[in-house]
Structures are given as structure tokens and as C-alpha cells.
Amino acid sequence: MFERTLFTEEHTLFRDAARRFMETEVQPNRERWEEQGYVDREVWLKAGAAGFLCPSMPEQYGGAGADKRYSTVLIEEQYRIGDSGLGFSLHSEIVAPYLLHYGSEHIKQTYLPKMASGEMIGAIAMTEPAAGSDLQGIKTTAVKQGAHWVLNGSKT
């Protein structure tokens, strides 16, 4: 076994808190969430209050401005308890960065703080009847007409 040198003492403290959260808030509820088909909103709010959502998001948008190693810690602790359906990493590491890098300032100010707090949950809606989740096969279009966008396509 080799010693990991990637993480600092701050990461270790964060890991301890993340581990406690996963063991007390996630693990006991996993089976129920699986049966009901969704994760309770309450755990998202608790995760946001604990700083476990969008940790690398800049502070001006509600995040901690932390480095990506904090996200790595969260993912490791989630998988340590055997969970893959929580959705925090999709929310924080895929959806939020899209908004951060490609959204207008209005979009960033409106949605990112709510995503960091757990008030809003990010998701990706990318499937179509003929394409499934193959992004290359998606036929939906968005065309700007004046001040508006016209969307054409179908959703599964």
C-alpha cells in the first residue's frame, strides 16, 4: 500500500464530514429512495447547508471556491458506501459547470446559488426517441428568431 499525498489536512477534515454525512443521511435511506424512484429533497438541502454541493463553484455564485479535490473526496465517500444514484456529482460537476461556463450572468446569478444550497437540483435532459442518450444522434434544434428561441424536437 502506498501513502496518498494528493490531499491536504483540510481535505481530510472535509472527508471526515463527508463520510459522516454519507453514513448518517444517505446510507440509511438508499433502499427507500430506490423504491420511491427519487432522492428526498431534504437531503439535498442538508448537503447544500454542509457545503457538499457545488464545492468548486466560485463564492460569488454560492460555492466555496474550493479545488476539485473536494469534489473527488465527495465522490469517493459516496462510492465508499456503495451508492451510485444520489446525483450530487452530476449536479455539481456536470450541470453547474455548464451554467458557469456557458450561461449568461443572469442565469449564473439566478440558478447557481440555488444549486449550491440544494434549493434547486440540476439534471440533464438529453434523450430523444430515436437517439436515446447518443448526443450525436439528437435531432432537436434551437433557432433564434428575434428575441426568442424556437425549439423543435421531441423528448422521451
Regions found by a protein language model. Name each.
Residues G63-A64, D83, H106-T156:
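Glycine-rich, Trp-frequent "lid" loop and neighboring beta-strands that shape
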Residues M1-E10, A142:
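Intrinsic disorder at enzyme termini
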Residues V39-D40, H91:
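Short, conserved alpha-helical segments within structured domains
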Residues D16-T24, E42-A49:
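N-terminal glycine-rich anion-binding loops that anchor highly charged ligand groups
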Residues Q27-Y38:
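C-terminal helix-coil-helix/basic helical segment that borders enzyme active sites and/or dimer interfaces
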Residues H11, M22, G51, P58, ...:
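Buried hydrophobic positions in well-ordered alpha/beta secondary-structure cores of metabolic enzymes
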Residues A49-E119:
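Internal helix-loop-helix
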